[in-house]
């Protein structure tokens, strides 16, 4: 039988709660404000939040719980343990993880890297090996692996190179300051020239084969050439010592007998160490900001300048009197530096004893002025740049430092540097020597150079390049000035190559001269002569 209500919509069923009135404490009633006693400003806290903890609840502190040790840790060894079977188990070969096992490979060293390390390849991946020379076959233990390269050290020399020699330094394996000390000096010059060619080929579009790259100018005596040192003072082996920290470690290498430093500096460092230890001096404490932090020694001719970087307590008068009494010391200074940054000249130097300036040739140099690291090669640099300049050319020099090279050139020169003390020394030397064709300007080097190139037409521009290289503003200023002659001086091969890449569309590279300013290291001082196309 068919239903009569089939296909008809049913009436909506009424809720059983529709006839109820809203509660006074409900959200609906409160929003309507039906009761004045339940307005927002008169409503009190809910009773749930006012509940007090049970008084009869006895909560013991955590420390009062008696923790019993687990029985698993108290198990005694089995009395029926079979030692024979254990020995048989130990005799079986075990599998160690890759982290605990270091790999060894025999490789051929192809070339030198920019830091003096040997470069080889394992399965087409590059590996950098310390104390390895080109054309050597060595056994290498891999210390580090990444996706792009590997690091390792030599465990055995299978076929040593003919260029290898004894480093003749007790601290060579720990210091790493002279990365090429194990190579003959003549071979060092050859490999540095090849390294320069590789860098130019990598970063520029120049035809390296067609460039006039002169052989590297070396030193007559490639030992004891460093005339300035700056070392931390630290407590080591029961006494105060000066030295350098090893690369990527916190281990100290003593530097009072370094073959790269002058013999006068080495002997003076030993005497200063003895004086500091005899007076029970303390090294720098970063927490209390007290103690001796750094020692700076500079040799200018036969004169020796000594400067201390200390904490808030300075340095005692007894120590300064004993150091000043040394025959070779001509000036003694100190400065305070308690910041985390190792800035030697943060607050300026205070003179304790001696002269305010040191005499170098015909020039006077103050303690805060830029100092010459290798005087022999600095003189060679001045001669090479003088040979590239025409005496009639008007020159703008960037980054002149204390202006010693500019003062020795015969050209009319405007020189710029950001060190105000160096510019002051250069200006005073020019006045004293009555050199009217020299002008020294203090300020931001790139900004001042752009200003002078815009307002005056110069014949030549000397750029003493920094690690940052050439900025876009300076490149634009050089382009708009139309200057015809450029001379770039740089200590960094990669930075120099990138700068030449920026200039190669406007200038031709005439000559590249390399000076071995720091023997036994992979660094060179490079002079590039460019002429506008």
Task: For the regions a language model picked out, list residue spans one by one.
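Basic Arg/Gly/Lys-rich low-complexity intrinsically disordered segments
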Residues: 1-112, 176, 181
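Terminal RNA-binding accessory module
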Residues: 2, 89-167, 171
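Rossmann-like S-adenosyl-L-methionine
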Residues: 38, 49, 57, 65, ...
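Short, acidic/hydrophobic/Gly-rich beta-strand patch recurrent on exposed beta strands
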Residues: 118-123, 243-246, 529
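Residue-level recognition of short, solvent-exposed, well-ordered loop/turn junctions
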Residues: 133-134, 224, 390
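Extended interfacial segments that mediate partner engagement and assembly in macromolecular machines
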Residues: 156-167, 174-285
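Internal alpha/beta scaffold segment
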Residues: 252-294, 312-334, 340
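Short, aliphatic-rich beta-strand segments
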Residues: 299-311, 363-367
């Amino acid at each position: 039988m068919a239903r009569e209500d089939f296909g008809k919509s049913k009436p909506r069923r009424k809720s059983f709660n529709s006839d109820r009135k809203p509660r006074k404490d409900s959200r609906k009633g409160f929003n309507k404000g039906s009761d004045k006693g339940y307005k927002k400003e008169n409503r009190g806290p809910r009773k749930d939040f006012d509940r007090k903890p049970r008084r009869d609840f006895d909560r013991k502190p955590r420390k009062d719980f008696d923790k019993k040790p687990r029985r698993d840790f108290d198990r005694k060894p089995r009395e029926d343990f079979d030692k024979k079977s254990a020995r048989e188990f130990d005799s079986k070969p075990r599998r160690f993880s890759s982290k605990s096992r270091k790999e060894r490979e025999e490789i051929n060293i192809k070339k030198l890297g920019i830091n003096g390390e040997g470069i080889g390849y394992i399965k087409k991946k590059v590996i950098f090996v310390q104390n390895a020379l080109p054309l050597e076959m060595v056994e290498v233990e891999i210390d580090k692996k990444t996706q792009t390269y590997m690091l390792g050290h030599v465990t055995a020399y299978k076929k040593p190179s003919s260029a290898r020699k004894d480093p003749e330094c007790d601290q060579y394996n720990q210091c790493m300051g002279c990365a090429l000390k194990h190579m003959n000096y003549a071979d060092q010059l050859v490999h540095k020239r090849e390294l320069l060619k590789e860098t130019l080929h990598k970063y520029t579009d120049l035809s390296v084969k067609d460039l006039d790259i002169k052989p590297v100018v070396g030193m007559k005596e490639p030992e004891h050439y460093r005339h300035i040192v700056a070392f931390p003072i630290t407590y080591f082996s029961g006494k105060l010592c000066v030295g350098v920290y090893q690369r990527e470690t916190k281990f100290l290498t003593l530097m009072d007998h370094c073959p790269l430093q002058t013999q006068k500096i080495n002997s003076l460092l030993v005497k200063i160490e003895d004086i500091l230890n005899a007076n029970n001096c303390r090294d720098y404490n970063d927490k209390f900001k007290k103690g001796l932090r750094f020692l700076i020694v500079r040799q200018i001719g036969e004169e020796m300048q000594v400067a201390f970087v200390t904490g808030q307590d300075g340095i005692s008068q007894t120590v300064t009197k004993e150091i000043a009494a040394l025959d070779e010391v001509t000036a003694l200074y100190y400065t305070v530096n308690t910041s985390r940054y190792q800035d030697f000249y943060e607050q300026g130097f205070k003179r304790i004893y001696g002269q305010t300036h040191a005499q170098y040739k015909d020039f006077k140099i103050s303690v805060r002025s830029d100092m010459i690291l290798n005087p022999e090669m600095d003189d060679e640099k001045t001669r090479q740049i003088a040979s590239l300049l025409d005496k009639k050319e008007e020159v703008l020099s960037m980054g002149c430092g204390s202006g010693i090279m500019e003062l020795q050139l015969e050209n009319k020169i405007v020189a710029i540097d950001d060190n105000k003390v160096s510019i002051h020394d250069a200006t005073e030397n020019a006045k004293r020597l009555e050199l009217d064709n020299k002008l020294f300007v203090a300020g931001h080097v790139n900004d001042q150079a752009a200003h002078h190139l815009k307002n005056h037409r110069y014949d030549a521009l000397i750029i003493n390049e920094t690690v940052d290289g050439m900025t876009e503003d300076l490149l634009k200023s050089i382009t708009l000035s139309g200057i015809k002659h450029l001379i770039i001086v740089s200590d960094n091969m990669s930075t120099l190559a990138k700068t030449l890449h920026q200039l190669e569309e406007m200038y031709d590279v005439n000559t590249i001269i390399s000076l071995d300013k720091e023997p036994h290291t992979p660094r060179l001082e490079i002079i590039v002569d460019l002429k506008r196309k």
